[in-house]
Amino acid sequence: MKNKLLFMMLTILGAPGIAAAAGYDLANSEYNFAVNELSKSSFNQAAIIGQAGTNNSAQLRQGGSKLLAVVAQEGSSNRAKIDQTGDYNLAYIDQAGSANDASISQGAYGNTAMIIQKGSGNKANITQYGTQKTAIVVQRQSQMAIRVTQR
């Protein structure tokens, strides 16, 4: 019941500026690419990108407060980038296999950033400006690298 209520709240709050991209590119099922920029209605936005296939890539840009950005990728060449400006934002990237790469950039205060990578090329970068910020990075082996900058 609690999960259902949370889902409904996120759906209602994110409705004015929600966008989602998932699955395969219509032109070629082996290349995934998604770019999402939300800049109107500057609060309570939710952007969710989920990809599965081969040459993954995703890019998000949000401006405002109380924003949610989620990118989840599965196999192959992965990449992801999230850029949020404003306060009380949450950015989440989860990648699974292959060349991985990830980046999150947040400005203002009260922001939370999470990157979870599971295998292969790994790299991660979180840059946060402002106060009251949280950064979480979990890498479960392969070549790994990490840079977290909080100012």
UniProtKB/Swiss-Prot annotation:
Keywords: Fimbrium, Signal. Pfam families: Curlin_rpt. Disruption phenotype: When disrupted in a cellulose-synthesizing strain (with a functional bcsQ gene), cellulose is made but colony morphology indicates no curli are made. The keyword Signal applies. GO terms for cellular component: cell outer membrane; pilus. It comes from the Bacteria. GO terms for biological process: amyloid fibril formation; cell adhesion; curli assembly; regulation of amyloid fibril formation; single-species biofilm formation. It is found in: Fimbrium. Residues 1-21 form the signal peptide. Induction: Under control of the CsgD transcription factor, part of the csgBAC/ymdA operon. Belongs to the CsgA/CsgB family. This is Minor curlin subunit. The gene is csgB.
